[in-house]
Amino acid sequence: MIQHLNTPNFSDDLMSESLNPFEVAVKQLDEAAKLAKLDKGMRDMLASPNRVLTVAVPTRMDNGEIKVYTGFRSQHNSARGPYKGGIRYHPQVSIDEVKALSMWMTWKCAI
């Protein structure tokens, strides 16, 4: 299975996508689900995070101005242990990136 995921066609197909991290993670899941012969219900369950939180963080700057920052937290799946990953502090972070990180941490910690 791992050998198949390292083939040029698999990574080339992903690189030709718009590089939305969550879409890449779901495509990786789809490929692994085919190889593992997962049923559609299990694949669908693993394709979505259990919980996604979006927060607004108002912050008073040194000059008195108030800026509102958006934060994201994704909890993908805790079936094989506690939730991990899914947090990133960066001005350009997207909710799709955080969801992908939480999905990848699920795979990493489950194996």
Regions found by a protein language model. Name each.
Residues 2-4, 8-111:
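N-terminal ligand-binding/catalytic initiation module
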